[in-house]
């Protein structure tokens, strides 16, 4: 469901990474490497928010380069700082996301929002929300539509213990039918998600997890 080949990125004269390859189907994969290694840059490339210098990404079998609309239609992306439009409410964001995915804000998503403790926050504007509340809004959006890939940058950051427990359940459920690819330094969270842990050293050659 998530595949990338020969990804490289540099800023000016600094090489962030080069020649990265990976191929994985349903399941949780946690990217854990040292600070400054390029984890957020890689996740942004996989989500299509920045471009790689070389290489290609496929989401749900769709090329992010040549079929961007189709690729992004099967993607949920949760950046580290989940700021949508500052004056947009959480409910408006979720309704817009549902519309983009040809679905509606259904009882499943609203139940997840409630479990995240968002009942009193859905009608607040993003600029009024805390860091953790914004993140929970974005994570709730992962249940909307028929997405195949979830990419998340430090998804447990800013969440309290009860929200982390909800997130673990969410990721384990999503991983039954989708790829959940996230970065995290939190070994306990990664273990609770039953995620496979990889580093950049594991991305230097094709690693096939489809078996």
Language-model features: locations:
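Catalytic Walker B motif of ABC-type/P-loop ATPase nucleotide-binding domains
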Residues: 150-154
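Helix-to-loop junction immediately C-terminal to a conserved catalytic motif
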Residues: 47
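Conserved ABC transporter NBD signature motif
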Residues: 55-66, 70-71
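ABC ATPase C-loop
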Residues: 143-144
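Conserved ABC ATPase "signature" region
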Residues: 95, 106-121
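Hydrophobic anchor residue at the start of the ABC signature
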Residues: 139-140
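A short, flexible loop at the N-terminus of ABC-type nucleotide-binding domains that lies
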Residues: 1-26, 68
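Q-loop/switch helix immediately C-terminal to the Walker
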Residues: 81, 86-102
